């Protein structure tokens, strides 16, 4: 079986969804920009040699509809002979895109794939056109379709206090801002054209979503967003709404060597699981455990974790049940996470994987794990190993 390697991993800056940098930039353009960038950064690869493109996107309608993967590839002037498919596993879409490409390479059906994902939550809102079947309520709690309420449920089940949530959310912003100031995101961010508050065209090379002034004390003043009477989850402890894309160049190890490209990481194992939709945010726990089992590892073997921060109330129970509460500041989301950077749904799986690989290189770490919760009760995880 072929070994699968990551040759390159990049992303756009994360733009605010409400009146942000990319308010006049379409999702296809964000995607095409990264596709072109991967090719220009790796000139040894001819675009015609790409076997397939796998691109995650959740709200596949409006500008994100009609197979955005193919639309973006055409905009990027990738040869018409190269196919492209859009993948949807909700929040895990672009990590699923990576898994799909990896399996194609493992079986020998492909040797080179572009993978990634995008979501423009400013142009295509998360709930646009959503119409749940009424019959779902016979099997699933109605609140299972309301992500904030699933986070509230997890916080109650696991004893996650409002103070713990506020402290974790403040940490996310502080660490993301520190990483920005130190230039730690420069290797992964591809400067991308957008517009400033006055509508002037500008090149963005930083995440505008981060709020460096955030403190736990300030967050403590916010009202509950989803359960006004008894809740603890606020807008400040939830992932920010943002627009962005992320992309990776994935190959068989033998093909990368043939082209003279240096692999940056190898996929050690992959896993996806289901869980109770009412606590959808718990999915990373069984997914991570399964991925670790497949790799013959335990959580203590992993040097660095990137765990998507859908909500502070959601990620903290996952950290607790993976036995990592005492190692948060040594291993988990060291550059902040989605609370600070945002969670463009179809982008996030590739985004956290990209951030993880860059962080592993900077800290000379051998093993890393990226994992996400998924709406309606799923979890997805990938174990990466430095080459």
UniProtKB/Swiss-Prot annotation:
Role description: Catalyzes the final step of fatty acid oxidation in which acetyl-CoA is released and the CoA ester of a fatty acid two carbons shorter is formed.
Subunit field text: Heterotetramer of two alpha chains (FadB) and two beta chains (FadA).
Signal sequence, start to end: none
Single GO MF descriptor: acetyl-CoA C-acyltransferase activity
Subcellular location: Cytoplasm
Taxonomic superkingdom: Bacteria
PANTHER family referenced in this protein's UniProt entry, alphabetically: 3-KETOACYL-COA THIOLASE FADA, 3-KETOACYL-COA THIOLASE, PEROXISOMAL
Pathway where this protein functions: Lipid metabolism; fatty acid beta-oxidation
EC number(s) per entry: 2.3.1.16
Active site: 91 (acyl-thioester intermediate), 343 (proton acceptor), 373 (proton acceptor)
SUPFAM superfamilies: Thiolase-like
GO CC annotations on file: cytoplasm
A GO BP entry: fatty acid beta-oxidation
InterPro entries named among the record's database cross-references: FadA, Thiolase, Thiolase-like, Thiolase-like_sf_Thiolase, Thiolase_acyl_enz_int_AS, Thiolase_AS, Thiolase_C, Thiolase_CS
Keywords from the named record: Acyltransferase, Cytoplasm, Fatty acid metabolism, Lipid degradation, Lipid metabolism, Transferase
HAMAP family assigned to the protein according to its UniProt record, in alphabetical order: FadA
Catalysis performed (reactions): an acyl-CoA + acetyl-CoA = a 3-oxoacyl-CoA + CoA
Protein name (database record): 3-ketoacyl-CoA thiolase
Major enzyme class: transferase
Family: Belongs to the thiolase-like superfamily. Thiolase family.
């Amino acid at each position: 079986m072929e070994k699968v390697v990551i040759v390159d991993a990049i992303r756009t800056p994360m733009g605010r969804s409400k009146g942000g940098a990319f308010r006049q930039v379409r999702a296809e353009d964000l995607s095409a920009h990264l596709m072109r960038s991967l090719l220009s950064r790796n000139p040894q690869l001819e675009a015609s040699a790409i076997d397939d493109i796998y691109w995650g996107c959740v709200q596949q309608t409006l500008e994100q509809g009609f197979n955005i993967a193919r639309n973006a590839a055409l905009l990027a002037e990738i040869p018409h002979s190269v196919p492209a498919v859009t993948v949807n596993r909700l929040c895990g879409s672009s990590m699923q895109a990576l898994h799909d490409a990896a399996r194609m390479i493992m079986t020998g059906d492909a040797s080179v794939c572009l993978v990634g994902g995008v979501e423009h939550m400013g142009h295509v809102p998360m709930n646009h056109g959503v119409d749940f079947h009424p019959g779902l309520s016979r099997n699933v709690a109605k609140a299972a379709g309301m992500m904030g309420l699933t986070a509230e449920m997890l916080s109650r089940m696991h004893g996650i206090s409002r103070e713990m949530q506020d402290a974790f959310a403040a940490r996310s912003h502080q660490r993301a801002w520190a990483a920005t100031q130190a230039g730690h995101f420069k290797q992964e961010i591809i400067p991308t054209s957008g517009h400033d508050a006055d509508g002037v065209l500008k090149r963005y090379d930083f995440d505008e979503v981060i709020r460096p002034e955030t403190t736990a004390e300030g967050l403590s003043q916010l009202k509950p967003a989803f359960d006004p009477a008894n809740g603890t989850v606020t807008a400040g402890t939830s992932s920010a709404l943002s627009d962005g894309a992320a992309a990776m160049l994935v190959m068989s190890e033998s093909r990368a060597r043939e082209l003279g490209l240096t692999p940056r990481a190898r996929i050690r194992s992959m896993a996806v699981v289901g869980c109770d939709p009412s606590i959808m945010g718990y999915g990373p726990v069984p997914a991570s455990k399964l991925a670790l089992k497949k790799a013959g590892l335990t959580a203590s073997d992993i040097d660095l974790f990137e765990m998507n921060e859908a909500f502070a109330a959601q990620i903290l129970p996952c950290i607790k049940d993976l036995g990592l509460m005492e190692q948060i500041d040594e291993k988990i989301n060291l550059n902040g996470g989605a609370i600070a950077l945002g969670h463009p749904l179809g982008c996030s799986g590739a985004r956290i994987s990209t951030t993880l690989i860059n962080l592993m290189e900077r800290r000379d770490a051998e093993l890393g794990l990226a994992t996400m919760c998924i709406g309606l009760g799923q979890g997805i995880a990938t174990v990466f190993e430095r080459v």
